[in-house]
Amino acid sequence: MTGDNTLIHSHGINRRDFMKLCAALAATMGLSSKAAAEMAESVTNPQRPPVIWIGAQECTGCTESLLRATHPTVENLVLETISLEYHEVLSAAFGHQVEENKHNALEKYKGQYVLVVDGSIPLKDNGIYCMVAGEPIVDHIRKAAEGAAAIIAIGSCSAWGGVAAAGVNPTGAVSLQEVLPGKTVINIPGCPPNPHNFLATVAHIITYGKPPKLDDKNRPTFAYGRLIHEHCERRPHFDAGRFAKEFGDEGHREGWCLYHLGCKGPETYGNCSTLQFCDVGGVWPVAIGHPCYGCNEEGIGFHKGIHQLANVENQTPRSQKPDVNAKEGGNVSAGAIGLLGGVVGLVAGVSVMAVRELGRQQKKDNADSRGE
């Protein structure tokens, strides 16, 4: 890596940890180790890509999710690796000063900056429900989009309207794509989306000058290419007909499938179960006992009832799955379980460090169960 390492070292990140981060991002997108090196070269380039982040009708959840990411200290890495020219929440200035800075950035970096929009855009009553500096937010967004090298809709609200567009939709909220017809908008839905999906997308744009492969809804396929149901840890219980019927019942306590509690995993695409959140094992809704509510999918999240049954798109049981009757520990060695975790982890696109932690935790759990 011949790029400038000053940024990395200034935040207490050594080269090894930084390369692990780049390798994890590449693995998340299903890319090779060569791609990891190319990403490392690009993101340490002193010519940082300018980013303009505009918030519309949003709750700031996407920003909070990004700032609380760790892999390691992604919040610092992102804010220093890119040149964040405008972000209302994170700006030290306010009022006329910050608006002037935004307009200067739009002119200075025309054709070079990445435009990120967070939140739905209200169109009813000429857009008066979200105003900035005396102008409807839709006008700010359209102006910024004219000179953008890439456009990203982050979060479900920006990707397809989200909660603001549900029900009677009093503000006439729409998605970013609807106000920018004819432009390619990269959608990264989620409420909030996993910050590493956003980071990996930006890293791909920085490295290759183009978006990653997108699906028919303009979502990166590395993150939204498979049904959550297909790689959920509770899927074996679904195949075996074991379902929790009420919160707190035996099935719920035993970790059985949450389909009958309204889990939308069978009709929602995402990598929630494999990437999880903030490098903490088991941190995603289903793992902590709550059904997925389909926030990644238009017409499902915020539209279907939380406990309304999902449409099962693929009812064929997986050909290879663990036995739901197997007891933890048993005759399977901790080393074998750690090795299995490593194989599954590589396939799922998680980091090597996460896999090692899985193996260490499994050994500890087995030792505890034996009373050692």
Curated annotation (Swiss-Prot):
Exported by the Tat system. The position of the signal peptide cleavage has been experimentally proven. Can also be exported by the Sec system. Residues 1-37 form the signal peptide. The keyword Metal-binding applies. Gene3D superfamilies: Cytochrome-c3 hydrogenase, C-terminal domain, NADH:ubiquinone oxidoreductase-like, 20kDa subunit. Binds 2 [4Fe-4S] clusters. One of its GO terms (cellular component) is plasma membrane. This is Hydrogenase-2 small chain. It comes from Escherichia coli (strain K12). The lineage of its organism: Bacteria, Pseudomonadati, Pseudomonadota, Gammaproteobacteria, Enterobacterales.
